[in-house]
């Protein structure tokens, strides 16, 4: 089959969950004999497409985008959809419900499409007013114009059922189970079990500020290592830095996956503040190397870590949990081992098989069939 993956920054995966999913799923589909095309954004600062024509068996189509928060995704996906409509494919996977206004073009080209709806983007603090209204409208359009909807967590599936009476295909991400070692931690002046870790974009709904404030209130002897940044959140980033004390180390973005895996594996705890997405790849990566997890208390995180995790809702609880982790390192390490057991439920091979099965169903479509209207039910704002 010809399968197109549209709506992300593309591969090689350097940025977020969608890109990791595209790489892990796409390379497996390609290895299975499918012709996989991945639409990629032109790297920043490059007039020429500096990506290869092929990567891990996937064909790459590199296109530009307007570098602005409100326009980057949609402009790149618009160019990708135009290219795809000219060249055709048997099935398309569009990532991010924000791209839903472009779905009618794919339908007009008779390309069956499944939309991965992502999390509840309209709840993110960076969107207000028109931006928030746009994301809520985009959810409705995705329901109306997709041949299938993909949810990566039960909570997301429940939301679409409640808000739109719309069925979804539930496919999570994978959690690679790794033993990355610790040979490179010395490059950062770190030792295994000698630090707490945060990995997140600096955005309010990821609760990096809450974690840093809570850590500062704690009596922790081990440093807090913070990995991440945000290209459009300068004010929030400044507030995070202002909240830190001398025990907090900011590393910025770490794009070296081997080094990042060693950071996860060597952490005495991994603090995870994400609150509005679905199944989060950073959380899966952490449990896959046995990092003990302290997570923000929402159903998406509890669905992944279950009883192996500890959960917080505010800075005071972060302080308590960090102190408890250092006070009983054996119990903390045992929770990390329990998390490894949960990681076994998230297997990239199984995820890719589910995408392949859905692609085959899409490819067999003769007509769009009856889709939900896209109208919100009265309970849809919950």
Language-model features and meaning:
Residues 262-278, 291:
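Acidic donor-binding loop of glycosyltransferase active sites
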């Amino acid at each position: 089959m010809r399968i197109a993956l549209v709506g992300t920054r593309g591969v090689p995966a350097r940025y977020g969950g969608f890109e990791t999913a595209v790489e892990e799923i796409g390379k497996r589909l390609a290895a299975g004999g499918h012709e996989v095309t991945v639409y990629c954004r032109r790297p920043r600062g490059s007039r020429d497409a500096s990506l290869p024509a092929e990567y891990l068996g996937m064909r790459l189509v590199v296109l530009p985008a307007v570098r602005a928060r409100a326009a980057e995704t949609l402009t790149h996906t618009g160019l990708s959809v135009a290219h795809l409509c000219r060249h055709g494919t048997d099935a398309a996977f569009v990532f991010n419900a924000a791209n839903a206004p472009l779905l009618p073009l794919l339908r007009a080209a008779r390309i069956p499409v499944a939309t991965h709806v992502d999390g509840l983007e309209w709840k993110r603090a960076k969107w207000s007013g028109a931006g928030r209204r746009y994301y809520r409208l985009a959810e409705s359009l995705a329901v109306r114009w997709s041949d299938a909807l993909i949810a990566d967590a039960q909570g997301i599936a429940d939301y679409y059922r409640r808000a739109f009476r719309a069925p979804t295909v539930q496919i999570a991400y994978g959690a690679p189970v790794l033993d990355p070692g610790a040979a490179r931690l010395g490059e950062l002046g770190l030792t295994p079990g000698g630090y707490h870790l945060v990995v997140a974009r600096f955005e309010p709904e990821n609760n990096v500020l809450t974690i840093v404030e809570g850590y500062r209130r704690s009596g922790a002897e081990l440093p807090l290592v913070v990995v991440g940044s945000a290209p459009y959140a300068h004010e929030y980033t400044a507030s995070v830095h202002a909240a830190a004390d001398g025990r907090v180390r900011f590393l910025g973005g770490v794009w070296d996956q081997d080094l990042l895996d060693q950071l996860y594996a060597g952490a005495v705890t991994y603090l995870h503040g994400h609150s509005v997405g679905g199944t989060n790849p950073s959380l899966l990566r952490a449990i896959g190397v046995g990092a003990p997890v302290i997570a923000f208390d929402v159903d998406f995180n509890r669905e992944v870590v279950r009883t192996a995790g500890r959960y917080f809702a505010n800075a005071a609880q972060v302080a308590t949990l960090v102190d408890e982790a250092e006070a009983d390192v054996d119990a903390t390490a045992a929770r990390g081992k329990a998390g490894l057991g949960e990681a076994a439920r998230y297997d990239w091979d199984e995820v890719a098989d589910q995408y392949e099965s859905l692609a085959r169903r899409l490819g067999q479509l003769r007509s769009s069939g009856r889709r939900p209207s896209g109208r919100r039910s009265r309970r849809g704002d919950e």
